[in-house]
Amino acid sequence: MMLQQVADALATHWLSGILAIATVYLATSYIIDYRRLRAFPGPPLGSFSYLWLAYNALQGRQGSIFYEVMKRYRVPEHSFVRIGPNDLMTDSPEVVRHMSSARSTYLRSSWYRTSKLDPSGDSLLSIMDTAHHDALKAKAGRGYAGRDNRNLESDIDDQLRRLIGLLERKYLSGGGDASSFRPVDMATTMQYFTLDSITKLAYSSAFGFLDLDTDVYGYIKAIRDAAPPIIVCSEWPLAGRIFFSPPFLKMFGPTPKDKSGVGKLMGTLRQVVASRFGPDAKDQPDMLGSFVRNGLSQHQCEQEVILQIVAGSDTTATALRGTLLQLCSTPMVYLKLQKEIDEAVRSGMVGEGVISQETARKLPYLQAVIYEGLRLNPPFTGALMKEVPPGGDEIDGVFIPAGVRIGVSAKGIQMRQDVYGHDVDVFRPERWTECDEQRRMRMAANTELVFGYGRWMCAGKNVAFMELNKVYFELLRRFDFQVVDTKTPVKEESFNVMFSKDMFMKVTKRVL
């Protein structure tokens, strides 16, 4: 009995000691973290805890929250707001270029760890080592940009014709009677188009989202369900180290044997990759074929194919549906663009087929709509945190210690009054046609930061612009769109990309 009491007492003292040491360690860490970035204003909770980032990551307003915190706490002296114990945020285009230039020594931070869904390897997005990233991008970049695909434009045209066919087949509305009213959720339909486009470009065969008019493999739902915890783990380093560690992913992550969702898609894509490396493999003029020709191994291709889907569909869909909604909500802009489209058709500038990218670039108001739409609907709203290199860095006259993560407010960069004027909240394509060429080029360079910059620029930027140039022209050429519910035109959540649904529109056929 006496020995048991002694043992219990020792156990209690050991436990108390461990808790005391842990408490002192955590308190000391918080004090050190607080002091090293105390010069930067920000939400008080964020200065010593990741709870502020974690809570706001789950609100579904990520892009707007980052913009609002920059507006509230940003000071004239520098371009940074503190959002975490070791984390800053900026809305400065100059800082973004500084961190991302080809010669920059900034690193990818732990934020990128959560883009890894397969524990067996890294993709171009999740790879942390800069030299390895650059070497991989040199091999895969031509494929992502579509430069090795001689059928790039015709493949996109084919999927656009399928989108038009779906609207004509199922969703054209007639008069006012109930039987002829067929509203379509254009938010979902736009994503079907981008998904089929990227799978056609990547593997020479679209997965059939448009033909089936359904979420093939439950991909969209799976990505939406996974987004909130992924964001929490990307912004909270400890959570990322735990839940995106190889052992955890092996036990709980998606696998190619899954019956639905991302895992099912992984399994399908691995079969596609395997067919390019088997004894009967044939070279194909698509993204995957480019990867193989440029020396990527079968395992490396398996890592890249899932990235192709996410990076090539969710992002562009955000810009497409957001801009379409703004067009429908701004009649003067809608009619002005439609007038330019009609004149291009009547003049013979555009034939009966899908407009070419070369011709689309010659239409000034269409280009203004594209850039204004990108500005107000950034395809990616995540923080994309970079890490300050060894030795620290001095920016705007303030020193930032090594190892600090710096995130980017995509919306903040696109709402800068010193770049776009005082009416930045307004969808006004005229700002692009009324200014001189020097100002237009400055605005364009700022807007194109939605695709990243320098070393970290999105390799698929060219493909995205090709889709944007064609979709607005062809849809407004053939149809009229009317928002069904003007009070709640769309349901949106921002989790790195914008997840949109229930953007119901009435579609009627135009006769030129």
From Swiss-Prot:
Membrane spanning stretches: 13-32
Cofactor dependence: heme
Localization (cell): Membrane
InterPro entries in alphabetical order: Cyt_P450 (IPR001128), Cyt_P450_E_grp-IV (IPR002403), Cyt_P450_sf (IPR036396), Cytochrome_P450_monoxygenase (IPR050121)
EC number, as in UniProt: 1.-.-.-
Keyword Heme: yes
Positions of heme binding: 458
Keywords: Heme, Iron, Membrane, Metal-binding, Monooxygenase, Oxidoreductase, Transmembrane, Transmembrane helix, Virulence
Pfam families, A to Z: p450
Pathway listed: Hormone biosynthesis
Membrane topology per record: Single-pass membrane protein
Superkingdom in the source lineage: Eukaryota
Broad enzyme group: oxidoreductase
Gene Ontology MF terms: heme binding; iron ion binding; metal ion binding; monooxygenase activity; oxidoreductase activity; oxidoreductase activity, acting on paired donors, with incorporation or reduction of molecular oxygen
An example Gene Ontology CC term for this record: membrane
Induction (record text): Expression is up-regulated in spores.
UniProt record, GO biological process: abscisic acid biosynthetic process
Record's function text: Cytochrome P450 monooxygenase involved in the biosynthesis of abscisic acid (ABA), a phytohormone that acts antagonistically toward salicylic acid (SA), jasmonic acid (JA) and ethylene (ETH) signaling, to impede plant defense responses. During pathogen-host interaction, ABA plays a dual role in disease severity by increasing plant susceptibility and accelerating pathogenesis in the fungus itself.
Entry similarity comment: Belongs to the cytochrome P450 family.
Name listed for the protein in its UniProt record: Cytochrome P450 monooxygenase ABA1
Organism: Pyricularia oryzae (strain 70-15 / ATCC MYA-4617 / FGSC 8958)
UniProt lineage: Eukaryota, Fungi, Dikarya, Ascomycota, Pezizomycotina
Gene name for this UniProt entry: ABA1
